[in-house]
């Protein structure tokens, strides 16, 4: 069995740490919240993010970055996108050998429009890069941690890394498929969060299934258009990392992005909705990144543009809806 250091103690990092431990691997989690660290070590739980879930007793946690760095040659990066570059640079400064980096972040860097694997590669010295991959797909942490059937995709430019991810995580309740389209899998995971926020708004406003179905379908079209422009295989968006992740995130109250949108749809201001979130809603930040990226690439993304107006320009919801529905006639 292997050793894996998990950087990040949020809901998904915790759920995947539990999967790894149940698969027989040694797991050390790293985080900054002393209460969460003590709770994992003493009570085998992380109630701040997964209330009521009992974790494998073999999992340990630390706030000592060097301890986590030296624990293994395989790292699971389960941090918000905006925190990744700084943490990876700190890790890199302490390394003296190659490590494998597996990430589960679903975002795009605001300043550079880079995917998370590109951020990690940028922040690593070449001599420390033993391979970078992603694990992504329709996988709410709340369901994974109680062993409900889940399927996800593992992707890396290096087939050996994809296979490593599959071998580490796959078991009788978590099925892992390999996928060689890293660009598509990462973009699918990041871009669907935009549509999830919009889907939550639609639900919060009280609209029915017709509107929700239209939003997801046309949202997938937007994701595919930008994805192809950035080098993704369009077929990837019909798989787990695309429509699979889109469906689960746009239809569930487990989704923090859907929840953020729902609060806004019910009449809360954006600031009020954000202040009530216990965890990071990546879709908020990704909307801004992708809006500007689409403008730069001249890609038509009307849902993203409308959501950007709501989130960052205080465009009223009813006005935004009228703009979307009143666009010029087009073929599908």
From Swiss-Prot:
<dbReference type="InterPro" id="IPR006109">
    <property type="entry name" value="G3P_DH_NAD-dep_C"/>
</dbReference>
<keyword id="KW-0443">Lipid metabolism</keyword>
<feature type="binding site">
    <location>
        <position position="256"/>
    </location>
    <ligand>
        <name>NADPH</name>
    </ligand>
</feature>
<comment type="pathway">
    <text>Membrane lipid metabolism; glycerophospholipid metabolism.</text>
</comment>
<keyword id="KW-0963">Cytoplasm</keyword>
<feature type="binding site">
    <location>
        <position position="106"/>
    </location>
    <ligand>
        <name>sn-glycerol 3-phosphate</name>
    </ligand>
</feature>
<feature type="binding site">
    <location>
        <position position="192"/>
    </location>
    <ligand>
        <name>sn-glycerol 3-phosphate</name>
    </ligand>
</feature>
<comment type="function">
    <text>Catalyzes the reduction of the glycolytic intermediate dihydroxyacetone phosphate (DHAP) to sn-glycerol 3-phosphate (G3P), the key precursor for phospholipid synthesis.</text>
</comment>
<dbReference type="GO" id="GO:0051287">
    <property type="term" value="F:NAD binding"/>
</dbReference>
<feature type="binding site">
    <location>
        <position position="255"/>
    </location>
    <ligand>
        <name>sn-glycerol 3-phosphate</name>
    </ligand>
</feature>
<dbReference type="GO" id="GO:0005829">
    <property type="term" value="C:cytosol"/>
</dbReference>
<feature type="binding site">
    <location>
        <position position="141"/>
    </location>
    <ligand>
        <name>NADPH</name>
    </ligand>
</feature>
<feature type="binding site">
    <location>
        <position position="32"/>
    </location>
    <ligand>
        <name>NADPH</name>
    </ligand>
</feature>
<feature type="binding site">
    <location>
        <position position="106"/>
    </location>
    <ligand>
        <name>NADPH</name>
    </ligand>
</feature>
<feature type="binding site">
    <location>
        <position position="11"/>
    </location>
    <ligand>
        <name>NADPH</name>
    </ligand>
</feature>
<keyword id="KW-0521">NADP</keyword>
<feature type="binding site">
    <location>
        <position position="137"/>
    </location>
    <ligand>
        <name>sn-glycerol 3-phosphate</name>
    </ligand>
</feature>
<dbReference type="GO" id="GO:0046168">
    <property type="term" value="P:glycerol-3-phosphate catabolic process"/>
</dbReference>
<keyword id="KW-1208">Phospholipid metabolism</keyword>
<dbReference type="Pfam" id="PF01210">
    <property type="entry name" value="NAD_Gly3P_dh_N"/>
</dbReference>
<dbReference type="InterPro" id="IPR036291">
    <property type="entry name" value="NAD(P)-bd_dom_sf"/>
</dbReference>
<dbReference type="GO" id="GO:0006650">
    <property type="term" value="P:glycerophospholipid metabolic process"/>
</dbReference>
<feature type="active site" description="Proton acceptor">
    <location>
        <position position="192"/>
    </location>
</feature>
<feature type="binding site">
    <location>
        <position position="12"/>
    </location>
    <ligand>
        <name>NADPH</name>
    </ligand>
</feature>
<keyword id="KW-0560">Oxidoreductase</keyword>
<feature type="binding site">
    <location>
        <position position="256"/>
    </location>
    <ligand>
        <name>sn-glycerol 3-phosphate</name>
    </ligand>
</feature>
<keyword id="KW-0547">Nucleotide-binding</keyword>
<protein>
    <recommendedName>
        <fullName>Glycerol-3-phosphate dehydrogenase [NAD(P)+]</fullName>
        <ecNumber>1.1.1.94</ecNumber>
    </recommendedName>
</protein>
<feature type="binding site">
    <location>
        <position position="257"/>
    </location>
    <ligand>
        <name>sn-glycerol 3-phosphate</name>
    </ligand>
</feature>
<feature type="binding site">
    <location>
        <position position="282"/>
    </location>
    <ligand>
        <name>NADPH</name>
    </ligand>
</feature>
<keyword id="KW-0520">NAD</keyword>
<feature type="binding site">
    <location>
        <position position="139"/>
    </location>
    <ligand>
        <name>sn-glycerol 3-phosphate</name>
    </ligand>
</feature>
<dbReference type="GO" id="GO:0047952">
    <property type="term" value="F:glycerol-3-phosphate dehydrogenase [NAD(P)+] activity"/>
</dbReference>
<dbReference type="InterPro" id="IPR011128">
    <property type="entry name" value="G3P_DH_NAD-dep_N"/>
</dbReference>
<dbReference type="GO" id="GO:0008654">
    <property type="term" value="P:phospholipid biosynthetic process"/>
</dbReference>
<feature type="binding site">
    <location>
        <position position="245"/>
    </location>
    <ligand>
        <name>sn-glycerol 3-phosphate</name>
    </ligand>
</feature>
<dbReference type="InterPro" id="IPR013328">
    <property type="entry name" value="6PGD_dom2"/>
</dbReference>
<dbReference type="GO" id="GO:0005975">
    <property type="term" value="P:carbohydrate metabolic process"/>
</dbReference>
<comment type="similarity">
    <text>Belongs to the NAD-dependent glycerol-3-phosphate dehydrogenase family.</text>
</comment>
<dbReference type="InterPro" id="IPR008927">
    <property type="entry name" value="6-PGluconate_DH-like_C_sf"/>
</dbReference>
<keyword id="KW-0444">Lipid biosynthesis</keyword>
<keyword id="KW-0594">Phospholipid biosynthesis</keyword>
